[in-house]
């Protein structure tokens, strides 16, 4: 089978930095124990399991503030998705040692919101409900930041037009954002636009749109909770018109999807360990639908070594 390896793909710098910071925290025995991560450090269950083996427990749930009730002492790591000021204050008030792994691109958006709200602006925030990044952004100024995911939510808003900005979750599809941005500009012609899709997300989406066209199928390797992974599959189907499946790893790959296919494109989300993507590519390269000996899926990755190396 011919495999088109979409490039760039996989880990972005924000994800790598967050994981390396968490690993250094685990290796620093001057920091108080136990060590918890407030939410998934990145949206990948394999990564979470690998950190558990490093002695770092992940607290999973949508409400970061409520999750903090489970921690009475030790060190807390904030994830790459960022947290609200209220969460930061609660962690300090509990006497916890804080390690902040917030992605710099997310911090940039938080700073923008903070600055504009101080100037009297309201903020339209395009994002996905239930995702930790919008939770953190909205928490900066709950009365002034308005989450928009669908057009009908926009139509229900009654906001002043003289001091209004629009920004977005960094991992959204740029085409989804444009769709809502256009509607917002039509509804609020004077709105100030700040497109905050991070460069890593943007170039990975553009790579799929531009490189997947000759494929019969696109496989996206990424966790089901990874927004950017799901968006890559969406880009393949809606922009490039190529059928796509998102899989967490090789063992979610259905052989039936491959029947009659000659060219398969592979990409991966920004939080997907590189070895897992390579494992999928290696399997596809040897796959022959007429040779059952090539159908068996075997784990070739050492799952204890999927985290980045701390230098």
From Swiss-Prot:
A GO molecular function assigned to this protein is: metal ion binding
What keywords are annotated for this sequence in UniProt? Answer: 4Fe-4S, Iron, Iron-sulfur, Isoprene biosynthesis, Metal-binding, Oxidoreductase
Q: Give yes or no: UniProt keyword Chloroplast.
A: no
Q: Do the record's keywords include Electron transport?
A: no
Residues that, per the record, bind isopentenyl diphosphate: 43, 81, 131, 226, 228, 271
GO annotation terms (biological process): dimethylallyl diphosphate biosynthetic process; isopentenyl diphosphate biosynthetic process, methylerythritol 4-phosphate pathway; terpenoid biosynthetic process
**EC nos:** 1.17.7.4
* Reaction(s) catalysed (UniProt annotation): isopentenyl diphosphate + 2 oxidized [2Fe-2S]-[ferredoxin] + H2O = (2E)-4-hydroxy-3-methylbut-2-enyl diphosphate + 2 reduced [2Fe-2S]-[ferredoxin] + 2 H(+); dimethylallyl diphosphate + 2 oxidized [2Fe-2S]-[ferredoxin] + H2O = (2E)-4-hydroxy-3-methylbut-2-enyl diphosphate + 2 reduced [2Fe-2S]-[ferredoxin] + 2 H(+)
Taxonomically, the superkingdom here is: Bacteria
Amino-acid positions noted as binding [4Fe-4S] cluster in the UniProt annotation, renumbered to this chain: 12, 103, 198
Show the stretches that span the lipid bilayer: none
Active-site residue numbers: 133
Cofactor(s) needed, names only, are: [4Fe-4S] cluster
Q: How is the cofactor bound?
A: Binds 1 [4Fe-4S] cluster per subunit.
Identify the enzyme class: oxidoreductase
**Residue sites binding dimethylallyl diphosphate per the record:** 43, 81, 131, 226, 228, 271
For the ligand ((2E)-4-hydroxy-3-methylbut-2-enyl diphosphate), the binding residues are: 43, 81, 131, 170, 226, 228, 271
What the entry lists under Gene3D superfamilies is as follows: 3.40.50.11270, 4-hydroxy-3-methylbut-2-enyl diphosphate reductase, catalytic domain (3.40.1010.20)
Instruction: Quote the pathway field.
Output: Isoprenoid biosynthesis; dimethylallyl diphosphate biosynthesis; dimethylallyl diphosphate from (2E)-4-hydroxy-3-methylbutenyl diphosphate: step 1/1; Isoprenoid biosynthesis; isopentenyl diphosphate biosynthesis via DXP pathway; isopentenyl diphosphate from 1-deoxy-D-xylulose 5-phosphate: step 6/6
Family according to the record? Belongs to the IspH family.
Task: State its role.
Answer: Catalyzes the conversion of 1-hydroxy-2-methyl-2-(E)-butenyl 4-diphosphate (HMBPP) into a mixture of isopentenyl diphosphate (IPP) and dimethylallyl diphosphate (DMAPP). Acts in the terminal step of the DOXP/MEP pathway for isoprenoid precursor biosynthesis.
HAMAP family from the UniProt entry: IspH
What is the recorded name of this protein?
4-hydroxy-3-methylbut-2-enyl diphosphate reductase
Upper lineage ranks?
Answer: Bacteria, Bacillati, Bacillota, Bacilli, Bacillales
Name the encoding gene, please: ispH
């Amino acid at each position: 089978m011919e495999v088109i390896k979409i490039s760039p793909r996989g880990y972005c710098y924000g994800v790598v930095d967050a994981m390396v910071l968490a690993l250094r925290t685990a290796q620093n025995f001057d920091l108080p124990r136990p060590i918890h991560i407030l939410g998934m450090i990145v949206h990948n269950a394999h990564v979470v399991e690998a950190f558990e083996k490093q002695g770092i427990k992940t607290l999973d749930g949508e409400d970061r503030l409520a999750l903090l009730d489970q921690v009475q002492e030790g060190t807390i790591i904030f994830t790459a998705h960022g947290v609200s000021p209220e969460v930061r204050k609660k962690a300090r008030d509990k006497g916890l040692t804080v390690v902040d792994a917030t992605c710099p691109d997310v911090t940039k958006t938080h700073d923008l919101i903070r600055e504009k709200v101080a100037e009297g602006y309201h903020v339209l925030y395009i994002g996905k409900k239930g995702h930790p990044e919008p939770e953190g952004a909205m928490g900066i100024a709950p009365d002034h930041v308005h989450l928009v995911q669908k057009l009908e939510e926009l139509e229900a808003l009654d906001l002043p037009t003289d001091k209004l900005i629009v920004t977005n979750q960094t991992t959204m599809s740029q085409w989804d954002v444009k769709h809502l941005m256009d509607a917002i500009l039509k509804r609020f012609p004077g709105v100030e636009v700040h497109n905050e899709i991070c460069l890593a997300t943007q170039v990975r989406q553009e790579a799929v749109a531009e490189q997947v066209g000759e494929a019969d199928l696109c496989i996206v390797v990424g966790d089901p909770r990874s927004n950017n992974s799901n968006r890559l599959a969406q880009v393949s189907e809606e922009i490039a018109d190529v059928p796509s499946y998102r899989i967490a790893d090789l063992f979610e790959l259905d052989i039936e999807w491959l029947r009659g296919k000659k060219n398969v494109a592979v990409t991966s989300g920004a939080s997907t360990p590189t070895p897992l993507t390579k494992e999928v590519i290696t399997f596809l390269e040897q796959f022959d639908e007429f040779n059952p000996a090539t159908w068996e899926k075997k784990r070739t990755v050492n799952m204890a070594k999927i985290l980045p190396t701390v230098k």
